[in-house]
Regions:
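Non-catalytic DNA-recognition/assembly elements of restriction-modification systems
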Residues: 1-11, 144, 148, 152, ...
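Sequence-specific dsDNA recognition surfaces
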Residues: 2-17, 30-64
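A short glycine-rich beta-alpha junction/loop motif
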Residues: 15, 88-97, 106-109, 124, ...
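A short beta-sheet element
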Residues: 28, 54-116, 138-139
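Interdomain boundary/hinge elements
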Residues: 94, 172-173
Length: 199
């Protein structure tokens, strides 16, 4: 990966410097979950003066964030999320890594999908360090990942195809949820009819 991205580690913002609201939101491990950047779950902010003095940790559109710490042996981290175009100042906290692509031959969405692949996760978690309960992934392990990069046009095609299949899976899951709801309502109606002697 180090041929196409650079790594930025986070800053150790102190909880006693957090304020209720400001223009500077700190992105912590809990904000990167299940491959989404979630800004409204227990948001924390720092004062303008701290934000401005730690601007080197300011995130940019299309940065790829990943969680570097979790439960050892459980593979409950290395979640990734792409930073969207937003008007907030987002600051990178410790134990959240940032990959910033410097190659014009990379589709960021393709790279995000590759980082979710089983072979990448197997390679990453084979380098896990830490103690009995806490697992860690280092920046070097991440940058040393070997991934196949097809031509840019093929990357675009792969992204479109995968997004098409993911949309179909989402429809199936929604249909399954709707069906379960219908089954539950039907069972309830049958019980109601039986109780009232109408069966």
């Amino acid at each position: 990966l180090d041929d196409i991205v650079s790594f930025q580690g986070g800053y150790a913002y102190k909880s006693n410097t957090y304020v209720n609201q400001s223009d500077w939101q700190v992105i912590r491990i809990g904000n990167v979950k299940n491959d989404n950047l979630i800004l409204d779950i227990q948001p924390v902010f720092v004062e303008d003066v701290i934000g401005k003095t730690t601007e080197k940790y300011l995130l940019k559109k299309d940065d790829i964030l990943f969680t570097m710490t979790g439960t050892k042996g459980k593979r409950d981290y290395f979640y990734t999320a792409k930073v969207p175009s937003i008007k907030k100042n987002l600051l990178l906290n410790q134990r959240v890594g940032c990959l910033r692509c410097f190659s014009s031959e990379i589709n960021i969405d393709f790279l995000c999908l590759v980082l979710k692949g089983e072979y990448v996760l197997d390679a990453i978690f084979s380098t896990e360090t830490g103690n009995v309960s806490q697992g860690n992934i280092g920046s070097e392990s991440t940058l040393n990942l070997n991934i196949a990069i097809p031509p840019l046009t093929e990357q675009h095609r792969i992204v479109v195809e995968i997004e098409k299949w993911f949309a179909l899976i989402d429809q199936i899951e929604q249909g399954k949820s709707d069906l379960q709801s219908t089954i539950k309502q039907t069972k309830s109606k049958i019980l109601d009819l039986a109780i009232h002697g109408k069966l």
